[in-house]
Curated annotation (Swiss-Prot):
It comes from Oryza sativa subsp. japonica. NADP(+) binds at R336, T578, S639, R640, K645, E646, Y647, V648, Q649, D681. This is NADPH--cytochrome P450 reductase 2. FMN binds at residues 117-122, 172-175, 210-219, 245. It catalyses: 2 oxidized [cytochrome P450] + NADPH = 2 reduced [cytochrome P450] + NADP(+) + H(+). It is found in: Endoplasmic reticulum membrane. Keywords: Endoplasmic reticulum, FAD, Flavoprotein, FMN, Membrane, NADP, Oxidoreductase, Transmembrane, Transmembrane helix. The gene is CPR2. This enzyme is required for electron transfer from NADP to cytochrome P450 in microsomes. It can also provide electron transfer to heme oxygenase and cytochrome B5. Can reduce cytochrome c in vitro. SUPFAM superfamilies: Ferredoxin reductase-like, C-terminal NADP-linked domain, Flavoproteins, Riboflavin synthase domain-like. It is an enzyme of class 1 (oxidoreductase). Its EC number is 1.6.2.4.
C-alpha cells in the first residue's frame, strides 16, 4: 500500500505544476495590452493559490504536531496504566479497560485509581497503592490514570465514569484552592455540571487529598469532589484523607490507606477467601542505568537547546528562552535582593496574556551539585543512560516509575537539572538510603526515622529543622545508593518554579518579565538555604552584556487572574513586595488601553514594603502610571519607617468607605502575595469592610464575599 503524500510533498507538487505556467504568465504580463493584463491577473491568482496552499499546509503541520503530542501523551498514560494493571502484550489497553463494566468476561473486578498532581506526589501515592493492592487482591485489576488523560474531550468524562464501579482519587490542592494542572479540566467539568442529578448509583469511591494546613483552602479540591460525588449518587467507602504537607504527608497517606483495606477486602475478596495475606514490603524503585564512554555519548546527549520545536509548550515541553535583561530592584542600602529579569521569547512561538504565570526550570548551583557528587561517590563527567524498562522492554517497578529524564547525560548535569537536593527527604527516601548503607548502625538509624516509632523524631530532626536531603546524607555517609535508586527513590525530580508574569504583551510582546525576591535564609539546623531558582535568577547573565548569556527552559501557564473585560469597571489591587508583579502587567495593559482611546474606570493599588529608600520596587514606573492615568491612586504602607508597623491591610481599613463604593459599583478586587499571612489578613479586613460598610451581619458578609469570589470579582494569586 502506498503511503499518502505529506503536506510538504503536496506543496512541492503544486509548485511543480504551476511553475511552467507561471513563467508563461510572467512573459505575457511583461508585454502590453489585454494579454498582459490577463496574464498578470492569472499570475496573481496562481500566487494566491500557492499562498493559500502554503498557509493550509502550515495549519496542517501544526494540527498534526498538536494531535501527535496529545496521542503520544495518551499512549504513554495507557502504557503506564496497562503495566500497573498487569496487561501485557496483546492485552487491552487502559482506555479500552476504562470503558468496560466491572466484572468483565475474565471475571476480574476493576478499580480505577485517578490522580491529579503538580509535583508528582499524588501520582506516586496512586501508583504505590496500586502496587500494594495488586499483591493483596490477585483477582482484581488496578488501573492508574491521569485525570487529564482519562477523557480526551469533556463529554467523555460522564460516559466513562458511568461505567466505573470502584474508583480511588488522589487529588492535590494547589495555589488558592485550585486543582492541579492535570486535574483542572476534570474539576471544571465536574463542578460546573449542576444539572446532572443522581447518576452515579453504582459508583463506590475513596479520596485522598494532598494539601497544606497553613493555607486557607486546605484540601479544598478533595473536599469539593467528595461532596459532589455524594450528591450525585456515589457511595463513599472511607472518610476523605486530608494529607498535610506541612507535617508528614506520608504518615497521613499510610493512616488513610489502613482504613481503606477493610473496605476493599469486602469488595474484592471472594467469600471463601479467608487469607489474611502477608505483610507487604514495597520494593525500592530503581531505574536501569548504563554507563557509556564519553566518545559514544557526546553526540547523543540531549538537552533543552532542542526544545523549541514543539507546537505547544507546557511543563513537559518547555521552550528555551535567553535572558535579555537583569537588574537589581533594591537600592544598595537594602540587605536583601530582588531581581527584575526578562526572558526573550521572540521567534519561539511562546505567547502569554496579562496575568499568566511563567514556569521556569533552572539548575542547582555548582556548590550544591559538587556536594552531591562527593556524597554519592561518582565522577561528575561520567556519562550514563537511564531507563524505566528492562533490556527486553518490560517495565520496571510494575510500570510505576515516572518516565526518566533525557539521556545520555553526565552525572553533573543530571544532578544539576533533575534532582531536588535541598528539600527535606521523605520517609521512603530514608528507607532507600538505609538499604544501601554499609554501616549497620546508620542503616538502623535511618529505618527508625522512617518507622512509626520514629515519627516524632523525624518530625523534629528532619521536618522542623528543615534538613535537606544532602544534609541527611552527610549524617549517614555510608549510604551510597546506585544512581538508578538515587533518581527513582531518593531525590525527587526538580520541579519548575512559577512566577506571576510582571509584564503585558501589549507593551512587551516578545519578552516575559519576572520579578523575583532572593531566597537566602538560615534554617533551624544552621544551614544557609539559597533558593534554587531565585539564586539562578540573581546570577543570570543577560544578552545585553554578552552573547554567551544565560538561558532557561520556560513555559506559560494560563491563569484566571485577569482584568475585567470592560476597562471602565473599577479595580482594586493589593500586592505588597513582589506581589506587585502581576499588577505591573495590569497597569501596562491599562496604559495601552488608555492610549488606544478606552475610558478607564477608577483603579487603586495598595502596595507595601519595608522602607521607601530600600525596597520600593518599580517606584518610578508606578509614578508614571499615575501621571499617565493608568492608575488613579497609589496607597503606600511602609512597615519599617515609622514607630509602628503599617501593612496594606491597615491602609485598607483606612480606605474602607472608598473600597465599599468601588465594590458597590461592580468593582473587582485582586490580591497577590503571601497566602499564609498577608492574604489571610486582607481577607479578614475585606470581610470587616463589607460587614460594616454594608450594614450586614457576619454570616451575610461572609456570603457576600463568597459571592464576589463565585462571580470572579475577587481573585487571588497567592503562594
Amino acid at each position: 500500500m502506498e503511503s499518502s503524500a505529506g503536506p510538504m510533498e503536496l506543496v512541492a507538487a503544486l509548485l511543480r505544476g504551476l511553475t511552467p505556467r507561471a513563467e508563461q504568465l510572467l512573459q505575457l504580463s511583461s508585454g502590453g495590452g489585454e494579454a498582459a493584463a490577463g496574464g498578470a491577473a492569472e499570475a496573481r491568482a496562481a500566487v494566491a493559490t500557492v499562498a493559500a496552499a502554503l498557509l493550509g499546509c502550515a495549519f496542517l503541520v501544526l494540527w498534526r504536531r498538536v494531535s501527535a503530542g496529545r496521542k503520544r501523551k495518551r499512549e504513554e498514560a495507557e502504557r503506564s496504566a496497562a503495566a500497573v494493571a498487569g496487561v501485557g502484550k496483546g492485552g487491552k489497553n487502559a482506555s479500552a479497560a476504562a470503558g468496560e463494566e466491572a466484572g468483565g468476561a475474565d471475571g476480574r473486578k476493576r478499580v480505577t485509581v485517578f490522580f491529579g498532581t503538580q509535583t508528582g506526589t499524588a501520582e506516586g501515592f496512586a501508583k504505590a497503592l496500586a502496587e500494594e493492592a495488586k499483591s493483596r487482591y490477585d483477582k482484581a485489576i488496578f488501573k492508574v490514570v491521569d485525570l487529564d488523560e482519562y477523557a480526551m474531550e469533556d463529554e467523555e468524562y460522564e460516559e466513562r465514569l458511568k461505567k466505573e464501579k470502584i474508583s480511588l482519587f488522589f487529588v492535590a490542592t494547589y495555589g488558592d484552592g485550585e486543582p492541579t494542572d492535570n486535574a483542572a479540566r476534570f474539576y471544571k467539568w465536574f463542578t460546573e455540571g449542576n444539572e446532572r442529578g443522581v447518576w452515579l448509583n453504582d459508583f463506590q469511591y475513596a479520596i485522598f487529598g494532598l494539601g497544606n494546613r497553613q493555607y486557607e483552602h486546605f484540601n479544598k479540591v478533595a473536599k469539593v469532589v467528595d461532596e459532589l460525588l455524594v450528591e450525585q449518587g456515589g457511595k463513599r467507602l472511607v472518610p476523605v484523607g486530608l494529607g498535610d504537607d506541612d507535617q508528614c504527608i506520608e504518615d497521613d497517606f499510610n493512616a488513610w490507606k489502613e482504613t481503606l483495606w477493610p473496605e476493599l477486602d469486602q469488595l474484592l475478596r471472594d467469600e471463601n477467601d479467608v487469607s489474611t495475606g502477608t505483610t507487604y514490603t514495597a520494593a525500592i524503585p530503581e531505574y536501569r542505568v548504563e554507563f557509556v564512554k564519553p566518545d559514544e555519548a557526546a553526540h547523543l546527549e540531549r538537552n533543552f537547546s532542542l526544545a523549541n520545536g514543539y507546537a505547544v509548550h507546557d511543563a513537559q515541553h518547555p521552550c528555551r528562552a535567553n535572558v535579555a535583561v537583569r537588574r537589581e530592584l533594591h537600592t544598595p542600602a537594602s540587605d536583601r535582593s530582588c531581581t527584575h529579569l526578562e526572558f526573550d521569547i521572540a521567534g519561539t512561538g511562546l505567547t502569554y496574556e496579562t496575568g499568566d504565570h511563567v514556569g521556569v526550570y533552572t539548575e542547582n548551583c555548582l556548590e550544591v551539585v559538587e556536594e552531591a557528587e562527593r556524597l554519592l561517590g561518582y565522577s561528575p563527567e561520567a556519562f550514563f543512560t537511564i531507563h524505566a524498562d528492562k533490556e527486553d522492554g518490560t517495565p520496571l517497578g510494575g510500570g510505576s516509575l515516572a518516565p526518566p529524564f533525557p539521556s545520555p547525560i553526565t552525572v553533573r548535569n543530571a544532578l544539576a537539572r533533575y534532582a531536588d537536593l535541598l528539600n527535606s527527604p521523605k520517609k521512603s527516601a530514608l528507607v532507600a538510603l538505609a538499604t544501601y548503607a554499609s554501616d549497620s548502625t546508620e542503616a538502623d538509624r535511618l529505618r527508625f526515622l522512617a518507622s512509626p516509632a520514629g515519627k516524632d523524631e523525624y518530625a523534629q530532626w528532619v521536618v522542623a529543622s528543615q534538613r535537606s536531603l544532602l544534609e541527611v546524607m552527610a549524617e549517614f555517609p555510608s549510604a551510597k545508593p546506585p544512581l538508578g535508586v538515587f533518581f527513582a527513590a531518593v531525590a525527587p525530580r526538580l520541579q519548575p518554579r512559577y512566577y506571576s508574569i510582571s509584564s503585558s504583551p501589549s507593551m512587551a510582546p516578545t519578552r516575559i518579565h519576572v520579578t523575583c525576591a532572593l531566597v537566602h535564609e538560615k534554617t533551624p539546623a544552621g544551614r544557609v538555604h539559597k533558593g534554587v531558582c531565585s539564586t539562578w535568577i540573581k546570577n543570570a547573565i543577560p544578552s545585553e552584556e554578552t552573547k554567551d548569556c544565560s538561558w532557561a527552559p520556560v513555559f506559560v501557564r494560563q491563569s484566571n487572574f485577569k482584568l475585567p473585560a470592560d476597562p471602565s469597571v473599577p479595580v482594586i489591587m493589593i500586592g505588597p513586595g513582589t506581589g506587585l508583579a502581576p499588577f505591573r502587567g495590569f497597569l501596562q495593559e491599562r496604559l495601552s488601553q488608555k492610549q488606544s482611546g478606552a475610558e478607564l474606570g477608577r483603579s487603586v493599588f495598595f502596595f507595601g514594603c519595608r522602607n521607601s529608600k530600600m525596597d520600593f520596587i518599580y517606584e518610578d514606573e508606578l509614578n508614571t502610571f499615575l501621571e499617565e492615568g493608568a492608575l488613579s491612586e497609589l496607597v503606600l504602607a511602609f512597615s519599617r519607617e515609622g514607630p509602628t508597623k503599617e501593612y496594606v491591610q491597615h491602609k485598607m481599613s483606612q480606605k474602607a468607605s472608598e473600597i465599599w463604593d468601588m465594590i458597590s459599583q461592580g468593582g473587582y478586587i485582586y490580591v497577590c502575595g503571601d497566602a499564609k499571612g498577608m492574604a489571610r489578613d486582607v481577607h479578614r479586613v475585606l470581610h470587616t469592610i463589607v460587614q460594616e460598610q454594608g450594614s450586614l451581619d457576619s454570616s451575610k458578609a461572609e456570603s457576600f464575599v463568597k459571592s464576589l469570589q463565585t462571580e470572579g470579582r475577587y481573585l487571588r494569586d497567592v503562594w
